[in-house]
Amino acid sequence: MKTVKYLLISIVLICSIQGCMDLNVPPVNVVTDDVVFGTEDGVKSFLARVYGAMPIEDFRYSQNNGINHFYALRSLSNLTGEALNRDVSSADHETHSYWSEAYMILRDLHYFIETLPSYQKKSGFSDAQVDQWTGECYFIRAMTYFAMVKRYGGVPLVTEVLEYNGDKLEDLDIPRASEEEVYNQIAADFDEAYRLLPEKTHASRANKYTAMGFKSRAMLYAGSIAKYNVANLVDPKTQKRLCGIPSDKAQNYFKLSYDAAKLLEGKGYELFTKAWSATDKEAQFKNFVDMFFDASSTENIFIRQYGYPTSVHGYDCYNVSRQYMTSNYSSYTNPTLSFVEMFDGFPRKANGEINVYDENGYYVLYDNPMDFFANAEPRLRATVIFPGDLFKGEALDAKRGIYKDPIGAGITRLLPEGSTERYNSAAATRDRITMSTNGNTQTVVTDSKGNRFNASGRSGPFNNDGVACLAGFGFRKLLNPNMSPDLVVENRSDHTWIELRYGEILLNRAEAAFELFLLDQGEQYRTDAYDCIKKLQERAGANITPAATNLTLDLVRKERRKELAFENKIWWDLRRWRIIELEQNNTTYRALMPFYILNEDKWFFDDRLDEDNRRYTFNTRWYYKNIPTARITESPSLVQNLGY
């Protein structure tokens, strides 16, 4: 066994990680090279470990705890306006550092790439096996550097094992590469993976087209930074631009993204339409729900598998609405009206907001709350649970309160537009509406016929209980509709995370193409962008954009935000477009509160600002994360990002 310890810059200073231990004494838990490289099983065990450590923002990711963490009560949707979370009351960013763990993965990948060839002959590995395994390492390296560059900008670029023999620690003090250099390395690694990998594998392992699919994502990010970023940080010693990419490079990166996405065309991937029908909204809804649970789906390009009891997550437990919970957790993801308003199928005000009023300014009354959503885009219905809609055979009971006054000619707006007052404390509403303080002790109301009603729904919202549908909607997307209620407990879910699907490839291709059209590269790019968007709109049951000439960049982005909602992608999109500070400038997101009218057996909806008055203001320094202070102390060549 080798006794020389190999390190990457992430592990400097040695004493801080190794406790100043003798580096020539092999740790007792280190596996020898013969065990790893001597058999196919050893290699597969290594690959399983690095695949598991690969940075993916999946079911076990949260912005405060990072990657591969069991306690994932927060998601990136809480930072984008997609959803409210009772534990998130203002704008924020990813507070967990992704630095040292990245370089530890990289060290292992480099060691594998450098060591495997020397074992090929004596272990009897074929050229095809060695190529595939090496290609997987290049793929994971590209993914790891992409996870870093989208957070920090330029980082120390290490592409081989660094040998440390105990003398010159300063040799491991590597300055940051430019952001452009890191993206170029990512592109090169994906290309090398494409060269080495086979055309077909199980979706949990990379193949040629997996590499190109992720290349399309990474290069789209790079192109956006080149075009939209304004931050500029230059290392005074190396003169490299650590944050930002020259704007004249945008076209090249968009073209790389477009070409990579187009390469997947005709390679066996397609939009999931197994239950879809062009004329049946119910089928379109069911198809979009089923898409995330069909193991044979040809839309899946790369997945992360889970399996009880060894590999689990708690997504269902944390995110089901209150009435469906069987543990101490629920309702951490609550879709906002601001999100819902992006979708088609609703009456609108002149300003584009959903309209809940008639021509006289009175609330429109409904026999059933689902009547309001009769024409809603099926993709939206598959993403959120509307009040009164079914989940696991049970209607979502979302009700803010019971309206008691006679309705006369009609009910006018309960509170002034823009109000964040609580209904139970506002003089205009506290005596007209009966509400429940919390979900444990419901207030009961009796109508003129002696019928008794809980004042608020079983899933809220309540006066003073955050375990509820905070914005009036339940959450559906990615929740297992077939999971038995008694199994909806912490760390019991084991359904698959789909990290890359063909729907995203079409979105990447459309956006890159439209950006190329805007850069005067030809009408054919706008036409291709339109064709991609139209396919997604048709599958979603959305309104179809009439023609390519009607397509805009905002429409392309909106389609992305609808299709990829709650898949932990939109936060990164808003970052690369550099628009979060425009959307979050003392912003309070909107809610849609359902009310039942006593003695009338009717419903109405009140559109309003979030009752808890959460306010979001994005700090533009968050477009680049701070490099951990300890790493800068250990490596003086590292330059901190702006604003920290």
Identify the role of each PLM range.
Residues 3, 16-41, 142, 186, ...:
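Bacterial Sec-dependent N-terminal signal peptides
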Residues 8-16:
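Bacterial N-terminal signal peptides
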Residues 20, 102-105, 185, 279-349, ...:
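Long, intrinsically disordered, low-complexity segments
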Residues 20-65, 372, 384, 628-644:
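Membrane-proximal, proline-rich intrinsically disordered regions
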Residues 38-60, 77-152, 169-208, 369, ...:
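Conserved, well-structured interaction surfaces
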Residues 61-77, 158-161, 198-213, 226-334, ...:
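Short, surface-exposed recognition loops and adjoining beta-strand edges that mediate ligand/DNA contacts
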Residues 149-150, 156, 201, 218-230, ...:
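Short coil/turn linking the two alpha-helices of tandem helical-hairpin repeats
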